Amino acid sequence: MATSKVVFITGATSGFGEAAAQVFADAGWSLVLSGRRFERLKTLQDKLASQVPVHIIELDVRDSDSVAAAVAALPADFADITTLINNAGLALSPQPAQKVDLDDWKTMIDTNVTGLVNVTHALLPTLINHGAGASIINIGSIAGQWPYPGSHVYGASKAFVKQFSYNLRCDLLGTGVRVTDLAPGIAETEFTLVRTKGDQAASDNLYRGTTPLSARDIAEQMFYIATLPDHMNINRVEVMPVRQAWQPFAIDRD
């Protein structure tokens, strides 16, 4: 039997998404978990199914038809989505823009922008129908607010997430649906290994000598946002570890 609250999490096979699944399950929410790696989804389902109902969807958010079909096919016990967490996203190629493969830029846009739009569009009718207490939590990044070398299209895609969240919030005024841009700083997840295309040494180097955020740190922020009183909306949350701050402006010197 489904609980009264259902969360739909994209990119649930690792990192923030996987941690969020655990946090929401611990609180008794039913889970709709999507991702491209089915075996990881199945493992997560097997882990959490003793706590709460779990529905998994092998899904590429870049494919709008597949997204629409998956939403239309949600079982009745999972159809009344309370919270959407648009977590699926990635960064590729931290090199300077002039050294990056164009396909990497396109992949980031297709996932971070188009994928987020596809899922949001498909679930808006459900969220609006739910009304008061429904939430959309879009996972942005400090890269969408603050420039740094190697951020190029990744930072621009997260700037889109921020502005889309603000604009969507305006459009949804009066529906009871909340919208939040959650922007993490440096966090130790699979994200960096993907960005370096499997270079474990380069990935490890980013975290060496410091204390980054954990995936659970961000998952707990998601849960806090999703469980606010119905009359409250947090527009944006920017979270950094204590040992991270803003970089100085870049200067070219002789």
Curated annotation (Swiss-Prot):
<comment type="subunit">
    <text>Homodimer and heterotetramer.</text>
</comment>
<keyword id="KW-0560">Oxidoreductase</keyword>
<feature type="binding site">
    <location>
        <begin position="8"/>
        <end position="32"/>
    </location>
    <ligand>
        <name>NADP(+)</name>
    </ligand>
</feature>
<feature type="binding site">
    <location>
        <position position="141"/>
    </location>
    <ligand>
        <name>substrate</name>
    </ligand>
</feature>
<comment type="similarity">
    <text>Belongs to the short-chain dehydrogenases/reductases (SDR) family.</text>
</comment>
<dbReference type="Pfam" id="PF00106">
    <property type="entry name" value="adh_short"/>
</dbReference>
<dbReference type="GO" id="GO:0016491">
    <property type="term" value="F:oxidoreductase activity"/>
</dbReference>
<feature type="active site" description="Proton acceptor">
    <location>
        <position position="154"/>
    </location>
</feature>
<dbReference type="InterPro" id="IPR036291">
    <property type="entry name" value="NAD(P)-bd_dom_sf"/>
</dbReference>
<comment type="pathway">
    <text>Organosulfur degradation.</text>
</comment>
<keyword id="KW-0521">NADP</keyword>
<dbReference type="InterPro" id="IPR002347">
    <property type="entry name" value="SDR_fam"/>
</dbReference>
<protein>
    <recommendedName>
        <fullName>Sulfoacetaldehyde reductase</fullName>
        <ecNumber>1.1.1.313</ecNumber>
    </recommendedName>
</protein>
<comment type="function">
    <text>Catalyzes the formation of isethionate from 2-sulfoacetaldehyde in the deaminative pathway of taurine. The enzyme is specific for NADPH; NADH is not a substrate.</text>
</comment>
<dbReference type="InterPro" id="IPR020904">
    <property type="entry name" value="Sc_DH/Rdtase_CS"/>
</dbReference>
